[in-house]
Amino acid sequence: ARGERYDDRHYTALLLAGLLHDVGKRPFVTDHAAEGARHAAVIMKRMGFDADIARWVRILVREHLTLSEFATGKNPNDPAVGESLARCVDRDPMLLDMLYDLTRADGSSLGATAGEEISKRYGWSHWRESLVRAMYSAARESIRVQVEGGYADVDFG
């Protein structure tokens, strides 16, 4: 889907986020997404990526559970919820798209192992897909409303 949806820089950031999104998982870490974002920033700098790619990867790693958490715990019909999610990706529609794709890939990779808590919370299904899509749409709408209201200059492609 790279040629249709993302330019090379955004696609690179998405792939790197996919590789690094769980880098913060280890014993005694309570928030592996935040821990992973700190590590991702260092890794991006050491690998010589430009500031934009490094920022996108850091945000995606930090927020890689957020869309699923919002979708299963908040009301997408509440405009404040869509706005809150939009702020997590700096109101950037491309970052929101990337977060959606990362969320789907991460959720789809989880098995339905009976004893595995993370599968119960984040595993993928048609039901979860519909919830995530509704929340994604709510955030996208929040960004669109702000653009039309003159708050930002964003190309929705």
Describe each model-derived feature in a short phrase.
Residues 1-10, 16, 20, 24-31, ...:
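Divalent metal-dependent phosphate-bond-processing catalytic cores, especially two-metal-ion Mg2+/Mn2+ enzymes
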Residues 50-58:
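Short, glycine/acidic-rich hinge or "gate" loops at secondary-structure transitions
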Residues 38, 59:
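DNA-binding alpha-helical recognition surfaces that contact promoter or target DNA
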